[in-house]
Amino acid sequence: MGFWENNKDSITSGLKSAGKYGYQGTKYVAKTGYKASKKHYNNSKARRERKSGKKNSSDEEYESEDEMEHERKPTDIRSLKDPKSFPPPPLKPGQKTYTGQQQQQMPNGQASYAFQGAYQGQPGAGSMEQSQYAQPQYNQYPQQQLQQGVMPQQPPIYGEQVPPYGSNSNATSYQSLPQQNQPQYAIPSQVSLNSASQQSTGFVSQNLQYGTQSSNPAPSPSFQNGLQCHQQPQYVSHGSTNLGQSQFPSGQQQQPTTQFGQQVLPSPAQPHPQPQQQQQGQPLPPPRGQVILPAPGEPLSNGFGQQQQQPLNQNNALLPQMNVEGVSGMAAVQPVYGQAMSSTTNMQDSNPSYGASPMQGQPPVGGQPPVPVRMQPQPPQPMQQGNIYPIEPSLDSTSSTPHFEVTPFDPDAPAPKPKIDIPTVDVSSLPPPPTHRDRGAVLHQEPAPSGKIQPNTTSSAASLPAKHSRTTTADNERNSGNKENDESTSKSSILGHYDVDVNIMPPPKPFRHGLDSVPSEHTRKNASERAVPILPPRNNVEPPPPPSRGNFERTESVLSTNAANVQEDPISNFLPPPKPFRHTETKQNQNSKASPVEIKDEVLPGHPSEEDRNVEPSLLPQSKSQSQSQSQFRRAHMETQPIQNFQPPPKPFRRSQSSNSSDSSYTIDGPEANHGRGRGRIAKHHDGDEYNPKSENSTENGRLGDAPNSFIRKRAPTPPAPSGSEKLHEGAITSEVDSSKDANKYEKSIPPVTSSIQAQQSTKKAPPPVVKPKPRNFSLKANEYPKELTREATGQDEVLNSITNELSHIKLRKINVNLEKLGGSKKVKDSSPVPSDLDEKYVSASGSITPPRPPPSRSSPKKVPPVVPKKNDNLKKKPPVVPKKKPLLKSLEPRPIEMERAYSGDISAADDNLNPFERYKRNVVPQEDDRLHKLK
């Protein structure tokens, strides 16, 4: 408490002050942050809008100022961008002109600066400042080029020359280099050496001065003695002898290397010894010096090379000055610089000395008196500016303009996109497109000859070959490039082209539709004759006659295609319905009913011919001879097919019934159920014929109607009465059994009918409407029976045949006792329809399934106790298939019976291998296709 009371005020005041300043600080920070974020957002927004082409006046103006500042910096750095223009080789000659412009501009700064240096050189260390001045002048000449490239290379001359380009920075670099030159100058401690070496070296003075100071200490005194006087006068005349010397320093180095010494040759090896050495080696051809200078640095090559070219030209005149001064190399360098500085005398001298490669040789020989002449004219310094610029156009008149273009670099200007070089191809050399010309020529040339040929020739065949031959000649003419012929024949060619195309495509349609039968015969007759009399009207109307020609071929092709289609269509119509019926029945009664199958085969070929005739006139009203030949061919083909078709297809149907009874039941059961109903009804009401023609006429026009009649004739006499009684009895049983199991019983009810009555009694097939409940009762029987049927079908075909024959004779009632006696044998049990056997089978099967009563009515022969366990297994396996059969039973009651016939005959042997494949055939492949494949 005491602490708080004592310090409460101070604490509160401190907290207040802290909170106050903290608030102020946070407020300030928040404001600044908000402003910065807003500014940044505006900048980014302005940039985005600029990209999109939008502009916000307020934000962008505010932002543009900042951006302009950022952009102004690169504009300030335009000097850096200028070297970008320099690096390309064309800038080498153009740099002179570019530097000349800059020199024109720079002389204001450089000249003043150089004059300052010169004046400084005069009052100060004459040689050093002379070199400074000479360097500015030399810089004035290659100003910009030497600025950037030379300064880094540290040919101080070039580097300093670059500073003159930017007079301030150049002054600094120039001053720094003169400082270097000064120590170098001080190192020789010879004004003449410094002036000469610095002049000779220029900014190379570091190179030459360092090298010349070390290598030329002795010549420097002599050079000092003679040159200093001359150099200063030259400095006076050129603005600075050192300026002349330093400005041509490369030339001086070159010449001093020869004169001053080839001692100075090590000096060229100095900071920019390479350009100078190259210049030294190349001073003879100053253009070479220009070319070589770019290698060390384009600015060097530009400034130095320019000076070399001009100063080298000046060097020849300056070399005598060097000689006059006593150091030919240095003196020559001075004159070169002087020429660079003073373009009047230097240019005059440069002409003799420019071409004179003996710059190095001339420095020793060079006349000294010319030096004072150049030393005297100081005004040429401005002349140098003017002269340097005119000299540049004189030397670089060709390349001056591109540099001028390059110099005004716009940072905002979009970067030039690289141009894609597209190879130019001579159109004349290329061959004309043969396809177009050929087509045009064929069209052009065909119509005229076609028009000529058609009136002349009466046969279309003659006109066509003539057209082709002429088209070939037309192609040759196309290659020759006869445009007049094409133009002249263009209209007729179009007509001829239409004649050809119209002959083929347009007319055949009307002929097909309107004149199918008659024109087809006429066209066939004319096909041999080629419609000779028809051609003249074709000549009158060119397009229609070719259509008639096209009609011959196309109608014939269409007739052939229609015939093929007709043949295929009736075959497809015949195959699906009769095959399933015949197949299922034939395989169910293969051994027992070989003769009925043969009768079917006999009946079918005649009917397919009728069906073919019925189908052909609709499809082929065009020609009767073709329809007859096609119908005969179909008959022969169908005669060959039915036997093969009957045997293989029942397997797929049975298999399909076994695997998917639903699909196969619809396809197979339709005819089979018709047979079943026809048989049962024929036995009872003789309705099988009426029912069969319905389904069979829908599927098979003539066969099925006759085939079921043949089957009924064979089977009907035996079953009628017993079938009715058994059907009634089985109907009651099945009605009772319906409550127990639908799917399993349905299967069981179907197989007994299939086994005993497969080909014998249609009476058992007649109850299919009651069969719906029957399959429920029949499931047990079906499970038992199909195994027995499979055993019998596999190894006991003869017994089955005998049983079926007995059943066909309606011995079922009579045979009930016999069948019971025969019940001990599985074969007899399968064939015996006795209800006692059925009871036994139900008892054997009823171990798992009830009741015993329903089986005795129908499935007694089919239900065999030994096979029952397998059928129980089958029941376990088949119930998933049974639900599919239930809807089928609802839709087609008679079908499941016959399907189970085929199912009972084939399932046991073919379920394992063929069920999935059969399902696939049922669902995907049409049954007709399957039969055809089997036939194949």
Curated annotation (Swiss-Prot):
Residues 166-244, 341-354, 453-462, 752-763 have a biased composition (Polar residues). The modification Phosphoserine is found at S57, S58, S64, S463. The keyword Thylakoid does not apply. It is found in: Membrane raft. Residues 69-84, 475-489, 513-528, 598-615, 738-748 have a biased composition (Basic and acidic residues). GO terms for biological process: barbed-end actin filament capping. The modification Phosphothreonine is found at T718, T850. Pfam families: AIM3 (PF17096). InterPro entries: Aim3 (IPR031370). The keyword Phosphoprotein applies. It is a peripheral membrane protein. Residues 59-68 have a biased composition (Acidic residues). Transmembrane segments: none annotated. Residues 1-315, 341-795, 818-893, 908-936 are annotated as: Disordered. It comes from the Eukaryota. Residues 36-54, 877-888 have a biased composition (Basic residues). GO terms for cellular component: actin cortical patch; membrane raft. Keywords: Membrane, Phosphoprotein. Residues 93-105, 130-152, 245-267, 306-315, 622-632, 656-665 have a biased composition (Low complexity). Residues 366-382, 851-868 have a biased composition (Pro residues). Belongs to the AIM3 family. Interacts with RVS167. This is Altered inheritance of mitochondria protein 3.
